[in-house]
Amino acid sequence: MSANLPPHHRMSSFSSVVFLTLITSGLAFAEDWGAYSIAPASAPGMVLEAAGAKVTIGKSSGAANQKWFVIAKDGEFCVIQPARDPSLWLAASGGGSKNGTPLVLEAASGAPSQLWNLKKLDNGNYNLIPQQAPEMGLDDFAGGKTPGSRIDLWTNKAGDQHLEWKVTALAGISAPPPAAQEAGSNYAPVEIKPEEIRRGAIKEFKFVQSKFFPGTTRDVTIFIPAQYDGTKPACVYLKTDGYKPAEKELLETMIATKEMPVTIGVFVKPGSLPPPKKGTLDRRNRCFEYDGVSDNNVRFFVEELLPYVAREYGLNLSNDGNDRCISGGSSGGITAFTAAWHQPEAFSRVYAASGSWVAFRGGNEFPTLVRKFEARPIRAFLTTATHDMENAAGDWFLLDQEMDKSLQFSGYDYQFRIVDGRHVAGYVEHWREAMAFLWKGWPERVKAGPSAPRAQEIIIPGEGWQLAAEGFKSTRGPACNAKGEVFFADTTANKIHRINLEGKVDEFVADSGQAHCVTIDADGKLYTISEKSGKLMSYDENGAGTVVLDGLTGHSILATSGAGLYVTSNGDKPNAPATVWFIKDGKKTKVDSGLKFATGMAIRPDQWLLSVADGHSKWIYSYQINQDGTLADKERFFPLHVADWDDDAGAESICYSLEGRQFAATRSGIQISADDGPTQVILPVPDRSRVTGVCLGGSNGDTLFAFCGNKIWKRKVQQHAVGAFSPWTKVNATKL
């Protein structure tokens, strides 16, 4: 690796070479492990592909000729191999070094024209530079956007998107390509004369009024810049762990150079609960407030501290997260990121030095959460130290690098620095660089990245959540019919509603017997079950009801393609085991018991596996469906994410997509599982409320609905509805 690269990149390069070499021979078992997609920044949706010995671009399809191995070779250079035939290497034809030299695949020789330097840019893209022509780069000629477009060498020019490439790990790895150069610190402080730096004012007070952390007291310092006049909302810089004079000078300098907008600083220490008698230890709240991964601290900042500061000091503070930055080191670093994570609308810019992503209070799970949750509009500048802290909670140096890799994996706009030193080394030294990066382009809004690869298979760029309807007393147990109409129960209001193909909600049944869930069979007939009435009802297309079975209370109901119904029931005795029933021809048969609290159900598109959610655990169970409707081969199969402050995932409703993905409505949002069990994607709704129902529907079957108490959210996705009306459909294995 290049001598100027941070140590972790030098080490990871060696391990990547070994790893990639080993997995090449096992391609049939894990086709994407270690492989990358190389896509032109100038042609979204296109990727580099091998067409015989020729190299061109094609529409992304996941084909083998669009997958590449990137393997470190000599110093800062690497070789790029097509995954379908690693004996060939990407090369400049004939060793050419002129504009227009075509790119080809050649038998490996180690020639300079086969060695490439991958230089990472500030925007996350890469220049691919051949060893024999360092002034040239891999070029999407004229920004071609059609399959078969010419790929050649061209003179490198900063900002030319034709020469920029997105290099994305497909599976198994999330680190940068092994020979990629970090952009590193190219920040040059803006020079300014000392007399041009205007000095701001400092105010100090103790805050003792917290309801989130009752009884605590804490020191707070306010910095008011000389440029502040109150005529418009000022930006906010919130610093955890209190005030240091150096940051006042840094703020004054950055505001004077206009690298930061006019910004009011709020420096707050963690709270402590004083003991009733002197001579003993107080209750130190720092770990509780800072290392906890709930939203308590950000709510304290947003609902208590900042309004108090604005009110008591007559300050016009912006409430927009795009105008706010939050900063800290160690536990103060993780709480800064946690604040932005829970409320990016309150803080969208984060500086965290030696962040404590360790197992104090669940912070060690953050790298995984960043990979699974849909990316959020957060820009971050993170650092770690070569001799960082290590204790029973974990190794800061390793876990900080895990956060680095996770943020890259999910496409976040961020920078990461490894600093020579100990815990929180370089915080002040990197402060100006961090602020320049975090505030670049302001007031342009910080945008969310593209999310992780598996999420990109579900969501559609630019198609976020929209409020579909609101004002209900409850929304439960949704289902769609073959046309794409979606039905759901408002149990509290004793109604069943329909979302028609125009997206409008109308009343379908005025008196539903407190139906708790609906389902629709292959013929379009709607069925309901109730936890109160004890009646299993059917309704025709006009909403006329008929009692199918009396004496059965149930949580959820599901129609099969074979004229049968499954019902989950939890009885009326506390802690009694739940039951799954199969109903056919008016008769009920107990087919399973033992779950803590059985809730939603779904049948896979190939119609032989039934999923049943346990709402009082983190599990969804899987069963084989026998021909007579009985169940066999029960496994606690799908683990769901449980937030640190929750006791269970709270799965209420589940459904499948035609493509074979399982969607679960949970406390954390909609969790989407791979066919073999793991949760790969989590889609929270905009107000972060619990999702109690999930369904795919709409005229094309590609609208995802999330039911959340009194609201319903919707968004277009790359998945499609399936139900009892659907034919048997083959399910393919989900990528890792």
Map each language-model feature to its residues.
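Lectin-like carbohydrate-binding module/patch detector with strong preference for beta-trefoil
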Residues: 30-175
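Short loop/turn segments immediately following beta-strands, especially the blade-tip
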Residues: 94, 623-630, 717-723
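Non-catalytic cap/lid and distal C-terminal segments of serine-dependent acyl enzymes
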Residues: 176-447
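Blade/loop signatures of beta-propeller domains
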Residues: 448-464, 579
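A short beta-strand motif characteristic of beta-propeller blades
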Residues: 464-469, 504-509, 544-549, 587-593, ...
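Beta-rich, blade/repeat-based domains predominating
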Residues: 470-485, 511-530, 534-535, 551-579, ...
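Short loop/turn segments immediately following the C-termini of beta-strands
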Residues: 491, 531, 570-572, 615, ...
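Blade-level signature of beta-propeller repeat domains, shared across WD40, Kelch, NHL, RCC1
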Residues: 695-736
